Amino acid sequence: MQLSWNKCSAGRWCLLHEVDLAAVDYQGVFVVWRNGGLDQISGVLYVGRGTLRGEIIDCRRHPVFKDPGLLLTWARVDHTRDLDSVAAYLYQRLRPIWGEVVPSAQPTAVNLPLTA
């Protein structure tokens, strides 16, 4: 399955705490990560799924995601029945530090966000 991963202006990844979610009123999957540098390691923190606006707002409120430099991308998934299998694939491939494993879903391969 081919997903369209969203970016913000000038083709840059969005900041979790700054992206305007007004138009993100559909279901899909999202990834929260941090870029590394000299003092920290890059890593995927979370893979989420569901109604995107609500799920991303919940992440913003959680203390784990308080770092203002966290990055975000999301993609629409048209069919509810595909959400768990897409999330299962992303979880297997991206190995987030936090999140829910989706053990009952057969993973459906998708293009990964960092290749978008």
Q: Whereabouts are the PLM-identified features?
A:
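Generic secondary-structure transition motif, activating predominantly at the C-termini of alpha-helices
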Residues: 60-64, 91-94, 98
